[in-house]
């Protein structure tokens, strides 16, 4: 008998299909300003390759590009299309270092390991910039991210972190900001201090992702879109099954992040999908624009549910805020994002949103990426916890290095202990929502 297609009910309980139509980009400012790019066919047959990559986000695209550069035959499968997921929907911040602050890494892993992790984080940001330059990707790549704090305790902690990076890691491009300095950059009384990091950067993430895809394709990578992987038969050579085709591969890279679903239970124990939301305002006049941001930088603040924002090239505010923890996005995305935005910028009360969209990322318990070799022929990288532009791009290169026998950085990243999330199956999301609600309540109360 032939293999049955997934039922409509099953598809609706899959984050790949819960909030979006097959193969269509979301109603985002990024999609509205996307560069001309290639489209790819659906897998319709059985093929063989050296490496099969599942997922066309930053991890998968970077791995494909670096493997192809080394002469490796690569097939990349995406359930929708390259750049469709979190890689094409996020805040576009290319953060410096790891998601976790260096002081905590030093305590948890020791100074030597912390330095190795710091260097990988540095290399990640540099990698993004080098790929943009090497492949002439037009994606508005610009320097500067501000970390903005609400409380004196947070400012004190940020001063400590900044001093540590300056003194012990030679980071001369990060500077502390006092209340006057930060309010001369950000037009909000909410923030009373923080730091600015000129080694960090921001970009148009969808155009970056599609630039990677086009470059990989030109180097010989076979990319297939609308090719949902529903099964992996593991062995000396894995067989990756889609509805209409199969791929036989010496190696497989699972690069699905928040859209993993039930494809691999070992990975799903380590990472949890959460939904995040962004809005793009109407075009702002010069006066209103300057009342928000006086520099062309990106901002991420100290809330547990982070607010992040920057100006677009056509003078809109791109503001991210709000999270959810189930399969479906909130019905009113505009209200979800407008609430935190007006707390920061009450002067935008009358400003309209032209675009609102959501996406799904993946977090780990420790907020560090989860890189693993699941068996001799299968790799995984996911759980970037909000720092995926740089680290997912780097993870793809690191997986490539290990496949080619250069395992130093993979050994460092895969040695990070990633605990399982509590609960099993249907209990996991409610438990996460309960924990996250506690932290959101702390945000509301100002802790």
Regions found by a protein language model. Give the residues of each.
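Extreme N-terminal leader/targeting segments of oxidoreductases
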Residues: 4-51, 69
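Flavin (FAD/FMN) cofactor-binding and adjacent substrate-gating region
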Residues: 11-33, 100-106, 129-144, 149-211
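N-terminal Rossmann-like FAD-binding beta1-loop-alpha1 element of flavoenzymes
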Residues: 47-76
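Conserved FAD-binding subdomain of flavin-dependent enzymes
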Residues: 66, 82-140, 156-168, 290, ...
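Hydrophobic anchor at the start of a short beta-strand
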Residues: 72-74, 174, 351
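Active-site substrate-recognition segment that forms the wall
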Residues: 126, 134-142, 229-230, 246-286, ...
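Helical element adjacent to the flavin cofactor pocket in flavoenzyme catalytic cores
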Residues: 163-164, 189-250
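C-terminal catalytic lobe of FAD-dependent flavoproteins
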Residues: 327-329, 334-444
């Amino acid at each position: 008998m032939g293999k049955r297609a997934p039922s409509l009910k099953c598809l609706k309980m899959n984050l790949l299909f819960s909030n979006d139509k097959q193969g269509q980009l979301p109603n985002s400012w990024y999609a509205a300003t996307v560069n001309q790019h290639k489209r790819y066919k659906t897998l319709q047959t059985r093929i063989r390759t050296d490496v099969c990559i599942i997922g066309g986000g930053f991890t998968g695209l970077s791995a494909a590009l670096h493997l192809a550069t080394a002469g490796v035959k690569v097939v990349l499968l995406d359930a929708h299309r390259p750049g469709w997921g979190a890689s094409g929907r996020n805040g576009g911040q290319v953060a410096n270092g790891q998601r976790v602050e260096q002081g905590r890494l030093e305590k948890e892993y020791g100074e030597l390991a912390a330095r190795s992790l710091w260097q990988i984080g540095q290399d990640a940001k540099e990698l993004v910039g080098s790929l943009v330059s090497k492949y002439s990707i037009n994606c508005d790549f610009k320097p500067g991210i501000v970390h903005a704090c609400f409380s004196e305790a947070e400012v004190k902690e940020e001063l400590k972190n900044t001093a540590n990076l300056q003194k012990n890691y030679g980071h001369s491009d990060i500077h502390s900001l006092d209340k006057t300095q930060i309010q001369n950059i950000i037009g909000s009384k909410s923030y009373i201090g923080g730091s600015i990091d000129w080694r960090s950067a921001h970009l148009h993430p969808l155009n970056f992702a599609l630039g990677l895809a086009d470059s990989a394709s030109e180097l010989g990578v076979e990319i297939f879109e609308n090719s949902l992987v529903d099964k992996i038969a593991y062995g000396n050579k894995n067989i990756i099954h889609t509805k209409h085709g199969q791929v036989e591969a010496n190696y497989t890279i699972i690069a699905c992040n928040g859209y993993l679903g039930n494809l691999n239970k070992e990975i799903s124990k380590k990472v949890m999908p959460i939904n995040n939301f962004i809005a793009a305002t109407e075009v702002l006049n010069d006066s209103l624009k300057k009342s928000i941001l006086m520099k062309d930088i990106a901002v991420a603040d100290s809330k547990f549910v982070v607010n992040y924002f920057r100006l677009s090239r056509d003078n809109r505010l791109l503001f991210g805020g709000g999270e959810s923890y189930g399969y479906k996005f909130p019905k009113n995305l505009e209200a979800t994002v407008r609430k935190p935005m007006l707390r920061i910028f009450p002067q935008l009360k009358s400003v309209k949103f032209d675009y609102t969209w959501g996406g799904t990322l993946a977090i780990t318990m420790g907020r560090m990426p989860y890189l693993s070799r699941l068996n001799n022929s299968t790799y995984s990288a996911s759980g970037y916890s909000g720092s995926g532009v740089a680290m997912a791009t780097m993870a793809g290169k690191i997986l490539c290095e290990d496949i080619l026998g250069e395992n130093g950085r993979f050994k460092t990243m895969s040695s990070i202990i990633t605990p399982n999330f509590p609960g099993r199956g249907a209990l996991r999301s409610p438990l996460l929502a309960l924990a996250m609600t506690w932290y959101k309540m702390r945000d509301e109360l100002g802790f």
